[in-house]
């Protein structure tokens, strides 16, 4: 697990580097599917002092199997998503400013241009609000459940992120670094959408044929973007 702990540590350290977190906000995890174990950031530990050895290993029930610290308070959300979506290898949660603003407004981040379409096939959805019962019960688990409810049967890697109403963004990918990459993009397109709608409040969504082209040339079966 040392290699995965190092990867998760490095991915967590990318959050302050890209301006996605303040203080100890945010967390990144990754899963070892063969062992059924998840590595995640410890709760409330400052990035400035955090080390790879501080990463916490939990099983799929959330029991700590390795580590001196308590795991992130959002661990149950991560685990619920890993259980539901076998294609996920890494998950990140932040409170990045612009993506969180869309979450607090209760609005999906609209697909307005090709930067968005290069990564997200359509709007980045916003979940419904959790009920008082859901919040007072197993809050973090129910956060995972409402994300799943919102995504439905969609392929999560085609929509590698979501904003949870009144809370903030979650993003995911094939591994921890990919998840952080998608979180960075989500923050950027959230900012772009806010600016664009401020310039033109009547701005419509990107044309569907242009969105399809940009997403499929990068992620489709005949993708030709980048190097092999």
Swiss-Prot record:
Entry's EC annotation: 5.1.3.4
GO terms classed as biological process: L-ascorbic acid catabolic process; L-ascorbic acid metabolic process; pentose catabolic process
GO MF annotations in UniProt: aldehyde-lyase activity; L-ribulose-phosphate 4-epimerase activity; zinc ion binding
Active site: 118, 225
Gene3D superfamilies cross-referenced by the UniProt entry: Class II aldolase/adducin N-terminal domain
Residues that coordinate or bind Zn(2+): 74, 93, 95, 167
Up-regulation conditions: Induced by L-ascorbate. Repressed by UlaR.
Catalysis: reaction(s): L-ribulose 5-phosphate = D-xylulose 5-phosphate
Pathway annotation: Cofactor degradation; L-ascorbate degradation; D-xylulose 5-phosphate from L-ascorbate: step 4/4
Binding of substrate, residues: 26-27, 43-44, 72-73
GO CC annotations on file: cytosol
UniProt keyword Isomerase, yes or no: yes
One Pfam family cited in the UniProt record for this chain: Aldolase_II
UniProt cofactor(s): Zn(2+)
CC cofactor note: Binds 1 zinc ion per subunit.
Keywords noted in UniProt: Carbohydrate metabolism, Isomerase, Metal-binding, Zinc
Protein name (Swiss-Prot/TrEMBL): L-ribulose-5-phosphate 4-epimerase UlaF
Lineage of the species this protein comes from: Bacteria, Pseudomonadati, Pseudomonadota, Gammaproteobacteria, Enterobacterales
